[in-house]
C-alpha cells in the first residue's frame, strides 16, 4: 500500500508549468470593472465625470441653479456646491479653523487654500522662483501662471483666448477669461420668461424687478419685499420684545431698537451730532443720518423720505363685549394720506396732532 501524500507535499511537488496548466483549466477570473462615467445630457456638451456630485455641479452651469443658499439674515448668497457654502459661512461666524503649524507663526485662516498660499508665500522655498527669460527683464515670480501672465507684456498678445464659437477674444489672465465666459453661458430665468442674465447678480436683479413676490405677515397682513424685513417686523408681534440696555456705567436707559440705542450713545454720552439740518433758520443736529432724513420731511413734505400713514384710532370695546367674545363689525374709513403744507401753523391741522418725524426716534 502506497503511503499517503499530504496536501502540502502535493502542492510543493507541483512545478511552475503544472501550476499554469491548472490555472488555465479552471474558471477564468472576472474582468476588472471599468470605471463608470457620468455624462452630461445637454446637447452640444461632451463633459463627463467620474463622480455624480461633479456632474451635478456641472449641470448647474447649464440651468443657472444654485441650490445651496446662505440663510444668514440679509445675506442670501447662493452657491453650486455645499463646500462653497460652508466656506462662505465662515465669513459670518469669523471662525478660522486652519492654523499654520510653522514654529512661531500660528496664523489662522478660514480656508485650506488660503493656508496653503500663506505657507508658500511666507515659509516656502525662496529658491523656487520663475524668472522671466526676456532680455533685460529678469523679473521673478513665485507661480508659473504669474510668469505667463507677465510675459504677455513683452509679446503684446494676451495669452488666454475664448474658445466660444465666433468669439476668439483674448485676455491677459485666466480670471478675466472666466468672467468673460459668463457672457456666452449666461443664467436663464426659470420663471417662464426668456431673460438671460450675463451674471448671477444680473439674474437676481431681474427676479426682484420682474417677478416680485411680496411676502405677507400672517398676523397683520403687512407686505414686505424681502424675507429678512419680515423677520425684523415679526419682533413687533412678539409677546416680550427685546430690550437693549445702555452699557455706559450709571445710565441704565433701555431701548427697543439698536438704532435708538446707538443714537442715544452718540448724542448723549459722546456728544456727537455730525448731521446738521441745512434748512434756513433750523440748524438742528442729529447723531444719525437717518434721523436727519426723517426730520427733513418737516420742511419739505413732498420728499418721499418717509411715508406717514394716519391710522384710525382703535375703537374701545365694552366689558360685556370683551367677556362675550363678540367683535363688532369694523367701520370702513378712508384714511387721509395727504401731508399739510409746512407753512401752516393752524393747531387744528393733522401736522399739529402728529408728532414730528424726528420725534419718532427718541434720543435721551
Curated annotation (Swiss-Prot):
C2H2-type ZnF: 38-62, 68-92, 98-123, 130-154, 160-184, 187-211, 215-237, 244-269, 275-299
Compartments where located: Nucleus
Gene Ontology CC: nucleoplasm
This protein's record includes keyword Endoplasmic reticulum: no
Domain of life of the organism encoding this protein: Eukaryota
Residue ranges of the region described as Disordered: 299-364
Any one Gene Ontology molecular-function term assigned to this protein's record: zinc ion binding
Keyword Metal-binding applies: yes
Keywords, sorted A to Z: DNA-binding, Metal-binding, Nucleus, Repeat, Ribosome biogenesis, RNA-binding, Transcription, Transcription regulation, Zinc, Zinc-finger
Bias-annotated ranges (Low complexity): 338-352
Any one biological process term the GO annotation gives: ribosomal large subunit biogenesis
Function according to Swiss-Prot or TrEMBL: Involved in ribosomal large subunit biogenesis. Binds the approximately 50 base pairs internal control region (ICR) of 5S ribosomal RNA genes. It is required for their RNA polymerase III-dependent transcription and may also maintain the transcription of other genes. Also binds the transcribed 5S RNA's.
The protein, known as: Transcription factor IIIA
Organism: Mus musculus
Encoding gene, per UniProt annotation: Gtf3a
Amino acid at each position: 500500500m502506497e503511503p499517503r501524500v499530504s496536501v502540502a507535499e502535493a502542492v510543493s511537488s507541483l512545478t511552475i508549468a503544472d501550476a499554469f496548466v491548472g490555472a488555465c483549466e479552471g474558471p477564468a477570473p472576472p474582468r476588472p470593472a471599468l470605471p463608470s462615467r457620468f455624462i452630461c445630457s445637454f446637447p452640444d456638451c461632451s463633459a463627463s465625470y467620474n463622480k455624480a456630485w461633479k456632474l451635478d455641479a456641472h449641470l448647474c452651469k447649464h440651468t443657472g441653479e444654485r441650490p445651496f443658499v446662505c440663510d444668514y439674515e440679509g445675506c442670501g448668497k447662493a452657491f453650486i456646491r455645499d463646500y462653497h457654502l460652508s466656506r462662505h459661512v465662515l465669513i459670518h461666524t469669523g471662525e478660522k479653523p486652519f492654523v499654520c503649524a510653522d514654529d512661531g507663526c500660528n496664523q489662522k485662516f478660514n480656508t485650506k487654500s488660503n493656508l496653503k498660499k500663506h505657507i508658500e508665500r511666507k515659509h516656502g522655498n525662496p529658491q523656487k522662483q520663475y524668472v522671466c527669460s526676456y532680455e533685460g527683464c529678469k523679473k521673478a515670480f513665485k507661480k508659473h501662471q504669474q510668469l505667463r501672465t507677465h510675459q504677455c507684456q513683452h509679446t503684446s498678445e494676451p495669452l488666454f483666448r475664448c474658445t466660444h464659437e465666433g468669439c476668439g477674444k483674448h485676455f491677459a489672465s485666466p480670471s478675466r477669461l472666466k468672467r468673460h465666459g459668463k457672457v456666452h453661458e449666461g443664467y436663464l430665468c426659470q420663471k417662464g420668461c426668456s431673460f438671460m442674465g450675463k451674471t448671477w447678480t444680473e439674474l437676481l436683479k431681474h427676479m426682484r424687478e420682474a417677478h416680485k413676490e411680496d411676502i405677507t405677515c400672517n398676523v397683520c397682513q403687512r407686505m414686505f419685499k424681502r424675507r429678512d424685513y419680515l423677520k425684523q417686523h415679526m419682533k413687533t408681534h412678539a409677546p416680550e420684545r427685546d430690550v437693549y440696555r445702555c452699557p455706559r456705567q450709571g445710565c441704565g436707559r433701555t431701548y427697543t431698537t439698536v438704532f435708538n440705542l446707538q443714537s442715544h450713545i452718540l448724542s448723549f454720552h459722546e456728544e456727537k451730532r455730525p448731521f446738521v439740518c441745512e434748512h434756513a433758520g433750523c440748524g438742528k443736529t442729529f447723531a444719525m443720518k437717518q434721523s436727519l432724513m426723517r426730520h427733513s420731511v418737516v420742511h419739505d413734505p413732498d420728499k418721499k423720505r418717509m411715508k406717514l400713514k394716519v391710522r384710525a384710532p382703535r375703537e374701545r370695546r365694552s366689558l360685556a363685549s370683551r367677556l362675550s367674545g363678540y367683535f363688532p363689525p369694523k367701520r370702513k374709513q378712508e384714511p387721509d394720506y395727504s401731508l399739510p403744507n409746512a407753512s401752516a401753523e393752524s393747531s387744528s391741522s393733522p401736522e399739529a396732532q402728529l408728532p414730528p418725524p424726528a420725534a419718532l426716534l427718541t434720543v435721551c
